[in-house]
């Protein structure tokens, strides 16, 4: 991808929710960004807003033409909107499903095309688009399957790309480092002073926390409940698209993304469009001013020292995969921290795994992955063995501070998954200091947030915490970012996001799972069978399957994943309590994971035995994250580790050099955005 675009185009601000707002769009242009008027349905309100915009905007502006716009291309040309004179749009953004074609307007304007996958991107390039808007799955309205973080990595094309979805100051900088030529904000602008948003909608936005959206027929919308929520007659794309809007929430679906919570934060911190555009621009400039982010990736970084190893890299616990001592040894031998997944193993199974791993590791750091939600008897049995054999580290998924404290008291440094800002604040107040921030790009159980909005939210919480607790507290904090990390580009982006924390002394590293499935050592050491690796390499998409109320897991499409709904329904017919259904489904997952990863299944007597590849393919659950869509070739652990550390640091340095030249950043300039972020 290329960054060949003007600095004016680095920050694109689209009027939110498919509503034309000339005042807001023109404010973006005046602030030095590219203000874009969403023409919505193309009704009289849109026509008047466009006419007003043409006379109001002193700087270049654009229009967005979504799937429901009734205006024709001819009406956008100057003089065709009912008011003679005024400026022409600088650019036209065609939304997914737009009735306009690139060729309809390419002779008059720069045409940017919104895309949600690689196929749409290639089609836009063939049609002659000037650039692409990578609309991640966390965005509001029509979306695809890949998050912004994953989609940007997937679009390795020689054409300018703007990232839309989950954009705040940290992720804006990361997107630019990752190769984007700019970023797009929309719902983030909704509560700023210039916005003319209806107060009822504004009130809904102020209460958002990022986990209150839902995918409905390929559209992300606000999940509203109660008698005032609109009734959706059919869960199909046309019906849902026709109900999108922000004028009457009793009859319309608000097309807001996971980043909707940022609207309140932007309004609180910056207040108006001018300060917001400057803050985003300054965050990018500050990110490339020095090598703080790159240093976090190199040998001997703060996280490396905290781990007691060479690299700031952890291999995430993977049920029925990272349960082999030989695989843990291979990970540790190349300088990373391996984690053995205990999942639902009983006491005897836990002992067998950990005794072998303990002996193999010979005093080197290693860890265990535990489920904080596992049945109490299983947790108790596992804890007895863990306390006895004392791995150096632990990760507790769905855990609580009390569980972490019990392990810490045994001398085991313990990380908690913190899946929301609310939980993170609770954990910090309880004294926890080691966290995993896992975006929904991961394989297996995932939370409601994709990486970009989650990391933007969680790092802001930590920065606020440090501002009140004092800078000395930074030395206690250790943070692992997970989800979609697998190569130079992705690790460089993650390091850029975390750079403000790194600069304050927080230890930051990356945690990977799916990337290890592509390594030769995963097969050689029995972590997975060759078929599992072939399935991962061939994956073109991932799917989410429901594991319990409010819980989903990411995997590769397979016969089992397609039939899963029926098996879940069978458990519900038995009228089990929800907690029992969740436990039974987790056991089912473990059994099917074993078939997929180890080629072992139970026979008619219940005993484990080897199964052939046909049964493995038919009955297996192939858990993997969105990285499976981004990779196709095998690698080695050594090459993987190099790519996300030294390779990523070098990548970041090269990108920073290019961006400093483009943005005319001097290394001796005083940073601006860091102080703004801490306000």
Enumerate the predicted regions with their spans.
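Conserved active-site-proximal phosphate/metal-binding subdomains
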Residues: 25, 126, 139, 145-160, ...
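Short, internal active-site loops enriched in acidic
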Residues: 374, 484-485
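Active-site entrance/lid segments in N-terminal catalytic domains of soluble metabolic enzymes
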Residues: 1-159, 170, 244-474, 639, ...
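Short pre-catalytic strand/loop immediately N-terminal to key active-site residues, enriched for Gly-Thr
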Residues: 481
């Amino acid at each position: 991808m290329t960054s060949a675009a003007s600095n004016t185009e680095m920050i694109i601000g689209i009027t939110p929710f498919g509503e034309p707002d000339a005042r807001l769009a023109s404010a973006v242009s005046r602030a030095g960004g590219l203000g874009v008027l969403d023409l919505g349905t193309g009704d009289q309100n849109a026509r008047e807003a466009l006419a007003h915009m043409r006379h109001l905007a002193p700087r270049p502006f654009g229009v967005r033409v979504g799937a429901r716009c009734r205006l024709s291309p001819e009406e956008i040309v100057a003089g065709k909107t009912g008011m003679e004179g005024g400026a022409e749009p600088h650019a036209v953004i065609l939304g997914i499903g737009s009735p306009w074609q690139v060729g309809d307007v390419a002779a008059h304007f720069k045409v940017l095309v919104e895309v949600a996958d690689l196929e749409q991107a290639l089609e836009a390039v063939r049609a002659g688009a000037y650039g692409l808007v990578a609309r991640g799955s966390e965005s509001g309205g029509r979306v695809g399957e890949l998050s912004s973080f994953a989609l940007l990595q997937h679009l390795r094309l020689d054409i300018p790309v703007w990232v839309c979805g989950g954009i705040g100051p940290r992720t804006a900088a990361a997107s630019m480092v990752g190769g984007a030529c700019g970023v797009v904000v929309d719902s983030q602008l909704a509560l700023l002073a210039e916005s003319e948003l209806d107060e009822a909608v504004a009130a809904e936005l102020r209460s958002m926390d990022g986990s209150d959206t839902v995918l409905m027929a390929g559209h992300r919308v606000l999940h509203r409940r109660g008698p005032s929520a609109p009734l959706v007659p059919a869960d199909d794309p046309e019906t849902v698209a026709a109900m999108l809007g922000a004028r009457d929430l009793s009859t319309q679906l608000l097309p807001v993304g996971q980043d909707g919570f940022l609207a309140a934060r932007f309004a609180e911190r910056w207040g108006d469009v001018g300060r917001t555009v400057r803050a985003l621009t300054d965050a990018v400039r500050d990110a490339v001013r020095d090598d703080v982010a790159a240093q976090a990736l190199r040998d001997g970084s703060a996280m490396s020292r905290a781990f007691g190893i060479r690299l700031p890299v952890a291999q995430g616990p993977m049920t029925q995969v990272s349960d082999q001592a030989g695989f843990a040894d291979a990970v540790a031998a190349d300088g990373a921290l391996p984690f053995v997944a205990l999942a639902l193993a009983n006491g005897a199974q836990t002992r067998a795994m950990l005794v072998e791993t303990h002996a193999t590791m010979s005093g080197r750091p290693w860890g265990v992955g535990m489920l904080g939600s596992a049945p109490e008897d299983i947790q108790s049995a596992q804890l007895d063995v863990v306390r006895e054999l004392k791995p150096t580290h632990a990760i507790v998924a769905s855990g609580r501070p009390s569980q972490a404290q019990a392990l810490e008291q045994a001398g085991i440094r313990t990380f908690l998954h913190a899946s929301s800002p609310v939980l993170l604040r609770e954990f910090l107040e309880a004294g926890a200091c080691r966290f995993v921030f896992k975006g929904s790009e991961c394989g297996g159980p995932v939370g409601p947030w994709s990486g970009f909005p989650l990391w933007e939210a969680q790092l802001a919480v930590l920065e606020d915490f440090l501002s009140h607790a004092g800078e000395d507290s930074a030395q206690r904090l250790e943070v692992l970012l997970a989800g979609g990390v697998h190569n130079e580009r992705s690790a460089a982006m993650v390091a850029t996001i975390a750079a403000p924390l790194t600069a304050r002394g927080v230890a930051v590293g990356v945690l990977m799972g799916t990337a290890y499935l592509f390594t030769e050592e995963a097969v050689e050491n029995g972590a997975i069978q060759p078929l599992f690796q072939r399935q991962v390499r061939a994956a073109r998409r991932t799917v989410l399957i429901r594991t319990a109320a409010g819980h989903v897991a990411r995997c590769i499409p397979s016969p089992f994943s397609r039939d899963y709904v029926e098996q879940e329904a069978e458990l519900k017919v038995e009228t089990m309590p929800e907690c029992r259904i969740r436990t039974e489904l987790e056991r089912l997952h473990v059994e099917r994971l074993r078939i997929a990863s180890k080629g072992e299944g139970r026979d008619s007597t219940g005993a484990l035995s080897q199964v052939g590849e046909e049964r493995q393919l038919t009955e297996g659950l192939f858990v993997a994250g969105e990285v499976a869509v981004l990779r196709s070739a095998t690698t080695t652990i050594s090459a993987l580790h190099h790519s996300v550390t030294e390779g990523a640091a070098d990548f970041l340095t090269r990108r920073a050099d290019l961006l400093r030249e483009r943005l005319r950043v001097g290394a001796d300039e005083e940073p601006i955005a860091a102080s703004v972020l801490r306000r």
